[in-house]
């Protein structure tokens, strides 16, 4: 009987998020044009350690998403771990699940703690799309004559479907056609995303989640403390922008997520561990689900992941206070709103990637962090974050504010 009670208590022990921070998001070739993904991640990793005053040697595992690893050096997550002062005995895993990488890292950490293979996990994501290199695939054999092929690592490994070589935006166009989303529909969604992010910036709603980054300039240093992209956007020009992927299409740069740089980190542990340390959890992880389908329909994979999560937890849209669904394209989030009947007033309330930017290895962790602080600011309790990814998949996580 005692053994049964012990097993039940172990199985029911909740996993909690005790610290969460992100960098500001930098525009492509913007404020972080000379800052590597490892450097960005190190800043927020040190920040979350300081947030709860934990000894970094006590962290068992560092799990960090990163998609564009070429040129970063061996084992980027391990580099962050060592640079952030974690023990040499701390394990490190670099996760590549394309745009879901940052969230998948957290889910791996969650499951490791539940399995008893780790007590405290640092998880998150990082990306410098600006510093992703060009690749010369035939250089090893030698370019003997004529012009040689040079491949954009960012496009080829981050933004391009390997099965037919179409860019992700091609499939956004197909999604818009399927759902009947007009150019105006998508423009209005994107404009609202920008306006929401600007309001959040001006009212200080991002302040608690952002860790400023000090960058070197030619003559001095400067501190970056807010997302770069929203203030650069000229809303008046959005309706006249050219289609980005099809000359007769409806998807533009404005209704697509911006190429960006940034990082996000969280610390998770069991509720018992947090209590023993006197730490107040930011959020409880209630569950997570994955959904996979045809690669060309990654745009609607969030719908399946969220629906599965609703059913797993016996939740529904009326029981969830806020949603964060990554705005890879406006139509991705609009499709989820349509099929799941989610009110836009409870979705991406501080704007999304169409306004803020989408550093692909970090964004999924970023939306979870934004969700946590948005729930707290609005006195909400339950939230779901979901991110789709190339290959036709999506992951979703449910949290509850204690």
List the model feature ranges, each with a label.
Residues 66-120, 162-167, 232-258, 339-371, ...:
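Conserved catalytic cysteine-centered active-site region
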Residues 97-127, 176-205, 265-272, 337, ...:
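Active-site-proximal alpha-helical scaffold in enzymes
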Residues 10-35, 47, 150, 235-300, ...:
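Condensing-enzyme catalytic core mediating Claisen C-C bond formation in acyl metabolism
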């Amino acid at each position: 009987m005692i053994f049964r009670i012990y097993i039940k208590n172990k199985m029911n022990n909740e996993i909690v998020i005790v610290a969460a921070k992100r960098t500001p998001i930098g525009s492509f070739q913007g404020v972080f044009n000379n800052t590597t993904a490892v450097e960005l991640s190190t800043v927020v990793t040190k920040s979350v350690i300081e947030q709860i005053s934990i000894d970094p040697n006590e962290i068992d595992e560092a799990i960090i998403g990163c998609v564009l690893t070429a040129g970063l050096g061996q084992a980027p997550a391990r580099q962050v771990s060592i640079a952030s002062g974690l023990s040499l005995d701390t394990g490190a895993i670099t996760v590549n699940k394309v745009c879901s990488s940052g969230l998948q890292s957290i889910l791996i950490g969650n499951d490791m703690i539940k399995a008893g293979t780790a007590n405290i996990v640092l998880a998150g994501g990082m990306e410098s799309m600006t510093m992703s290199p060009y690749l010369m695939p035939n250089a090893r054999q030698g370019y003997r004559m004529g012009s040689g092929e040079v491949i954009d690592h960012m496009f080829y490994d981050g933004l391009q479907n390997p099965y037919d070589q179409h860019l992700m935006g091609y499939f956004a166009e197909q999604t818009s056609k399927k759902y009947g989303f007009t150019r105006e529909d998508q423009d209005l969604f994107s404009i609202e995303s920008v306006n929401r992010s600007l309001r959040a910036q001006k009212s200080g709603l991002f302040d608690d989640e952002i860790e400023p980054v000090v960058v070197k300039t030619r003559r001095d240093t400067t501190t970056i403390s807010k997302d770069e992209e929203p203030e650069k956007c000229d809303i008046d020009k959005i309706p006249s922008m050219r289609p980005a992927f099809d000359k007769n299409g409806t998807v533009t740069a404005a209704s697509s997520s911006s190429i960006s740089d940034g990082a996000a980190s969280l610390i998770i542990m069991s509720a018992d561990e947090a209590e023993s340390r006197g730490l107040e959890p930011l959020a409880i992880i209630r569950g997570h689900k994955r959904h996979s389908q045809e690669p060309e329909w990654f745009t609607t994979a969030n719908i399946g992941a969220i629906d599965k999560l609703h059913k797993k937890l016996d939740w529904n849209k009326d029981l969830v206070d806020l949603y964060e669904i990554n705005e890879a394209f406006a139509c991705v989030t609009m499709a989820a709103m349509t099929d799941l009947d989610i009110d836009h007033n409870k979705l991406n309330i501080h704007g999304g990637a169409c306004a803020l930017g989408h550093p692909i290895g970090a964004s999924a962790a970023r939306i979870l962090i934004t969700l946590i602080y948005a729930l707290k600011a609005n006195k909400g309790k339950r939230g779901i974050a979901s991110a789709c990814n190339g290959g036709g998949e999506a992951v979703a996580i449910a949290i509850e504010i204690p």
